[in-house]
């Protein structure tokens, strides 16, 4: 197996196959569930808006893949600093049956100098998730934070407040996951000594098998080849799947989605 094939198979099994579009429908989510079951294995999860969780749960069960996890988003995509709203959305997502919640960190508040609201918001959502045995990923929106110091600070605050994963991006801003921001975030995980309990998720902009290989190489360099399993690493993507399947000898590499 070539290096690209090997990394593509790894990446496929680490994907949070995503649709977060304004025109999402039950039919599109059902199709996403079907795509998550591939000839070479299943994706780790799908990521969808909360209202689609029940139909996704039903579809995954019916197609014989009940262990594909269902992730959703809250405080999305703007990362506002209203803790009550973020918490209410997170509780609603849990009530819908989410296995994982990806909450947006109040990154604009951090840029303006307010570190406390980010901690408090993540902690409130973590408490709700922990009580329901739901995984919490925190989206820090690296493409808007821009500066290394802010990316580092948002990562640190999120981890201190209980994040199970730190995630680069919503996919809704001009700059999403980059190898540079990925390295900064994973270095925080390393420097804080939390690599056993905290994972990393690049999202948006990871579109090709070669992209995925680059992002995995950074994880392997920092933590060794065995760290990036589905409890410690995810790719938030949709168009990536077709490229991975093509690298693995399935399909033509074309995708219907741009995330």
From Swiss-Prot:
It is an enzyme of class 4 (lyase). The active site is at residues 102, 167, 201. Keywords: Cytoplasm, Lyase, Schiff base. GO terms for cellular component: cytoplasm. InterPro entries: Aldolase_TIM, DeoC, DeoC/FbaB/LacD_aldolase, DeoC_typeII. Catalyzes a reversible aldol reaction between acetaldehyde and D-glyceraldehyde 3-phosphate to generate 2-deoxy-D-ribose 5-phosphate. Belongs to the DeoC/FbaB aldolase family. DeoC type 2 subfamily. This is Deoxyribose-phosphate aldolase. The gene is deoC.
């Amino acid at each position: 197996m070539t290096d690209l094939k090997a990394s593509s198979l790894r990446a496929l099994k680490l994907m949070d196959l995503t649709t977060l579009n304004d025109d999402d429908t039950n039919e599109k989510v059902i199709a996403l569930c079907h795509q998550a079951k591939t000839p070479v294995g299943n994706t780790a999860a799908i990521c969808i808006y909360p209202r689609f969780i029940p139909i996704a749960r039903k579809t995954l069960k019916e197609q014989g893949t009940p262990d594909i996890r269902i992730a959703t988003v809250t405080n999305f995509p703007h990362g506002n600093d209203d803790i009550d709203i973020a918490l209410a959305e997170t509780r609603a997502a849990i009530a819908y049956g989410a296995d994982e919640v990806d909450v947006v960190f109040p990154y604009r508040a951090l840029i303006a100098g307010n570190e406390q609201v980010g901690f408090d918001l993540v902690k409130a959502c973590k408490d709700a998730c922990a009580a329901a045995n739901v995984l919490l990923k925190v989206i820090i929106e690296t493409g808007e934070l821009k500066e290394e110091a802010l990316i580092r600070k948002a990562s640190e605050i999120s981890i201190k407040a209980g994040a199970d994963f730190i995630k680069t991006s919503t996919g809704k801003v001009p700059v999403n996951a980059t190898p540079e921001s990925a390295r900064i975030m994973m270095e925080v995980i390393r420097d804080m000594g939390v690599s056993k309990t905290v994972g990393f998720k690049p999202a948006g902009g990871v579109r090709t098998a070669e992209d995925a290989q680059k992002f995995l190489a950074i994880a392997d360099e920092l933590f060794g080849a065995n760290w990036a399993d589905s409890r410690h690493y995810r790719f938030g993507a949709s168009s990536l799947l077709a490229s991975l399947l093509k690298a693995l000898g399935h399909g033509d590499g074309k995708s219907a989605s741009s995330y």
